[in-house]
């Protein structure tokens, strides 16, 4: 059953229904669901689907020829077109009479083996775009290649595409649709552990407990997720060992460049190059205090929940996992889950605020959200605010997010109010998010203060 991606499907269907030549670029990280999306889109449509392989031009030409002949004759035959230009031009001409979708999946594999492919496509698009009803879809997992060689203004295909779709992980709300049998708390835990990548979500069975799922995936040497982060890095980057060391450092608490470099044992400038690649892959993110531009106080954190969970808990327990001691390893992980979920809950709360804004239900019309941290000059102590979103230089919202088993009390609100003064906004709306709800005193305060909004987690899930 296909779940989600309604916006992307609508975009593809609008292109298809135009009846004229269309050229869409679909890209995103591995396991993100590109092929599943396209397969769902082309159901009941005239389509030729070709998947490139990491081989030479001859092999890929034979494969695309087979795909074309299978479409035209119903069966694949042995003869191949003499060139990619001949093969793709044949499809362009077929599409002069009827609507056809041509999908070139794993395009970077083919383009690397056939250096002239991009220029060939440019030539054919320019020649047939006014007469052919072809809908061409290029799909690729190599983010850097798709952005530099297909979408960049320097690329031969620049200016030819009519749409581009960058597939991102599912949001928390979208991910919850895969876990209908879970309680609200279990849904949050599942999202915090596997994130929003469809292939990772599918490894969890919502008819089994979170504990059983973790044991059967992350703590099982024969499971897909057990070696997935390392395997994915091997496919995407050179020197995966250094990348692994950097992600491990970040997942276990190092956030500043100097701390990461020290833990990895490499120069900070060297680490910066590797971190840039990890940011492009959507595995980590760079943060600066809200409202500031580039800052020496910038920090780095994991943006992909599955990577964060894996690097936080799996490497240190390799030996035990290899010996089948999943129960013992989970007993070591469990006490840290509440603390681990703190950052996940902040992300869930930020997503909730965006949903409220888009639904016209947020009192502050912010354009961005982020964390803020800095020094309280009065106390000389470090202060942090989980979420800040400004409407203008005078108006903002601030939020505190608590994933604990205790109800949030007035002390948390008072701390948030005091810290918000460090930002300098005149008009502030305060949000408190809580896994376990609020004390009566806190509820009474919210009823008396329209600038205070309490959001229990059960309201968000």
What spans do the regions from the language model cover?
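A cross-kingdom feature that marks ATP-driven nucleic-acid transaction machinery
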Residues: 290, 299-461
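Phosphate-binding site recognition
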Residues: 1-331
């Amino acid at each position: 059953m296909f779940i989600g991606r309604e916006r992307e499907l609508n975009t593809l269907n609008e292109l298809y229904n135009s009846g004229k030549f269309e050229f869409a670029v679909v890209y995103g990280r591995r396991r993100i669901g590109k092929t599943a999306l396209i397969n769902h889109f082309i159901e009941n449509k005239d389509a030729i689907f070709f998947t490139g392989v990491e081989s030479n031009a001859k092999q890929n030409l034979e494969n695309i020829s087979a795909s074309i002949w299978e479409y035209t004759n119903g069966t694949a035959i042995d003869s191949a077109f003499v060139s990619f230009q001949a093969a793709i031009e044949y499809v362009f001409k077929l599409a002069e009479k009827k609507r056809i979708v041509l999908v070139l999946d794993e395009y970077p594999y083919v383009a690397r083996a056939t250096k002239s492919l991009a220029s060939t496509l440019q030539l054919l698009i320019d020649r047939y775009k006014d007469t052919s009803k072809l809908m061409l879809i290029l799909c690729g997992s190599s983010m850097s290649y798709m952005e530099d060689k297909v979408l960049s203004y320097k690329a031969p295909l620049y200016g030819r595409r009519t749409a581009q779709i960058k597939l991102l992980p599912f949001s928390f709300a979208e991910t919850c649709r895969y876990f209908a049998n879970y309680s609200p708390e279990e849904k949050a835990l599942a999202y915090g552990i596997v994130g929003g990548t469809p292939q990772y979500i599918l490894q969890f069975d919502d008819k089994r407990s979170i504990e059983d799922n973790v044991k059967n995936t992350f703590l099982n040497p024969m499971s897909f997720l057990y070696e997935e982060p390392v395997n994915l890095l091997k496919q995407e980057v050179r020197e995966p060992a250094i990348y692994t060391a950097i992600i491990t450092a970040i997942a276990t608490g190092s956030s500043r460049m100097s701390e990461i470099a020290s833990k990895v044992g490499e120069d900070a400038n060297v680490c910066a190059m590797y971190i840039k690649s990890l940011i492009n892959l959507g595995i980590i993110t760079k943060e600066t205090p809200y409202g500031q531009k580039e800052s020496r106080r910038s920090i780095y954190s994991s943006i992909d929940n599955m990577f964060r969970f894996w690097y936080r808990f799996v490497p240190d327990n390799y030996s035990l996992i290899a010996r089948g001691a999943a129960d013992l390893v989970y007993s070591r992980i469990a006490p840290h889950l509440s603390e681990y979920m703190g950052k996940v809950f902040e992300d869930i709360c930020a997503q909730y605020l965006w949903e409220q804004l888009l639904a016209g239900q947020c009192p502050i019309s912010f354009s961005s959200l982020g964390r803020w941290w800095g020094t309280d000059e009065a106390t000389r102590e470090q202060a942090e605010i989980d979420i800040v979103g400004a409407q203008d230089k005078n108006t903002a919202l601030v939020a505190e997010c608590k994933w604990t088993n205790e109800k949030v009390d007035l002390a948390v609100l008072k701390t948030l109010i005091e810290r918000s003064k460090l930002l300098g906004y005149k008009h502030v709306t305060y949000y408190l998010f809580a896994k376990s709800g609020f004390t009566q005193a806190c509820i009474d305060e919210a009823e008396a203060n329209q600038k205070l909004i309490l959001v229990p987690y059960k309201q968000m899930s």
